[in-house]
């Protein structure tokens, strides 16, 4: 396993056999995301984007109680006490958010415990979300009196629909795992005992597939969500061409012809 060197120990990043691991490592605060951690997220995602050996990335929280419980509110009095400070805070945190949003390889969120506020915003950047039965997901911004940034709101509404998004935002309630599955907020519910194994098996399946095809598929779905049909088709045309010119496609045709 290859360890990626970051300027913080609150974000851990590793690569092993085509799979990247990003761990939120502040369990004493239920992995609340500090500004230092946002910097680490951006650094780690940039490294894993550039690493051709990385086919898929798994995000998880340390400690077994939370994926991430939102922003580290203990910093707010010093770093985010008013609108002016919010903009300064955003200038630093936005790099991590942007890398999560534009990461070209599949992202998997392994949710075990609380996934709240900014933690849910991180999970919404994942392409696939696994959760344990005891997990709780929600956005309690209305209880704290703070504004939730547009990208997170838009991602939530696209995923669960405007009606459910309004319910979650207005009530500030936390969804249990079975409701999160029903509304489409998570893809799979698996036991706490098996989640690491189940997520790893799923990631290995992705890593074994043709990377250009997987990349093009992710780009196509993302374009479908964000653009008009004409803009979406244009955005992925080059990626589709790259698939047809790849060695994976040639080998796939040979394997099919030879019935392998």
PLM segments and residue spans:
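C-terminal alpha-helix plus adjacent terminal tail
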Residues: 1-17, 52, 64, 172-178, ...
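Conserved CoA-thioester-binding segment of acyl-CoA-metabolizing enzymes
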Residues: 1-60, 98
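Terminal peptide-recognition signature
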Residues: 22, 26, 40-41, 59, ...
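Generic structural signal for alpha-helix termini and adjacent loop/cap motifs
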Residues: 27, 51, 79, 103, ...
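Hydrophobic alpha-helical membrane-association signature
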Residues: 37-40, 89-92, 195, 236
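Glycine- (often His-adjacent) and acidic-residue-rich active-site loop
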Residues: 61-98, 145, 227-228
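Crotonase-fold acyl-CoA enzyme core
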Residues: 98-211, 246, 251, 258
């Amino acid at each position: 396993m290859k360890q990626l060197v970051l300027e913080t120990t609150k974000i851990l990043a590793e690569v092993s056999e085509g799979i990247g691991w990003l761990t939120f490592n502040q369990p004493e605060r239920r992995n609340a995301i500090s500004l230092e951690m946002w910097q680490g997220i951006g650094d780690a995602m940039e490294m894993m984007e550039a690493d051709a050996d990385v086919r898929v990335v798994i995000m998880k929280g340390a400690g077994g109680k939370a994926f991430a419980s939102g922003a580290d509110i203990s910093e707010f009095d010093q770093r985010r006490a008013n609108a002016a400070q919010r903009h300064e805070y955003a200038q630093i945190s936005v790099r991590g958010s942007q890398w999560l949003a534009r990461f070209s390889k599949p992202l998997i969120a392994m949710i075990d415990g609380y996934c709240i506020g900014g933690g849910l915003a991180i999970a919404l950047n994942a392409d696939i979300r696994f959760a344990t039965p005891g997990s709780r997901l929600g956005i309690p911004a209305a209880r704290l009196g703070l504004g939730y940034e547009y990208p997170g709101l838009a991602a939530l509404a696209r995923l669960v629909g405007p009606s459910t998004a309004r319910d979650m935002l207005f009530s500030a309630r936390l969804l249990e795992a079975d409701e999160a599955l029903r509304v489409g907020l998570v893809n799979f519910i698996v036991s706490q005992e098996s989640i690491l194994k189940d997520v790893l098996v799923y990631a290995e399946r992705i890593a074994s597939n043709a990377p250009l095809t997987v990349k093009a598929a992710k780009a196509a779905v993302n374009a479908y969500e964000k653009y008009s049909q004409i803009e979406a088709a244009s955005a992925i045309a080059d990626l589709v061409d790259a698939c047809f010119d790849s060695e994976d496609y040639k080998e796939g045709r040979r394997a099919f012809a030879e019935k392998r």
